[in-house]
C-alpha cells in the first residue's frame, strides 16, 4: 500500500485523511514517519508521542495505521441483526 491508496481507503471508510500526518510533522494526532532504520506509527498529543510502533516498510506502517483507524472511526460498520419476536 502506498500513501495515495492509504488516503483513498480512509475516504472509503468515512475517515478524514487530515487526521494523519506524514514524516516529521509536529501536529497532534496520528503520525507516520520514516526513522533511520524503520517506519513508525504513533500518536502525538500536546507535544508528546505515544504508542510508537516500528515497521520494516512504509506499506506495513500504512496498513497498521489503516486497521487502527478503521477500528476506531469507520462508519461503515455492519448493523447488528434484529431479532423477530414470535407470537
Model-identified regions with their sequence ranges:
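Negatively charged, low-complexity tracts enriched in Asp/Glu with abundant Ser/Thr
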Residues: 1-24, 56, 79-85
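Short, solvent-exposed secondary-structure capping/transition elements
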Residues: 73-78
Amino acid at each position: 500500500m502506498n500513501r495515495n491508496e492509504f488516503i483513498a481507503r480512509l475516504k472509503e471508510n468515512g475517515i478524514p485523511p487530515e487526521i494523519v500526518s506524514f514524516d516529521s510533522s509536529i501536529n497532534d494526532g496520528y503520525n507516520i514517519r520514516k526513522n533511520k532504520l524503520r517506519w513508525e506509527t504513533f500518536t502525538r498529543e500536546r507535544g508528546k508521542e505515544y504508542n510508537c510502533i516500528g515497521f520494516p516498510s512504509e506499506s506495513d506502517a500504512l496498513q497498521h495505521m489503516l486497521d487502527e483507524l478503521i477500528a476506531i472511526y469507520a462508519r461503515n460498520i455492519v448493523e447488528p441483526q434484529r431479532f423477530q419476536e414470535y407470537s
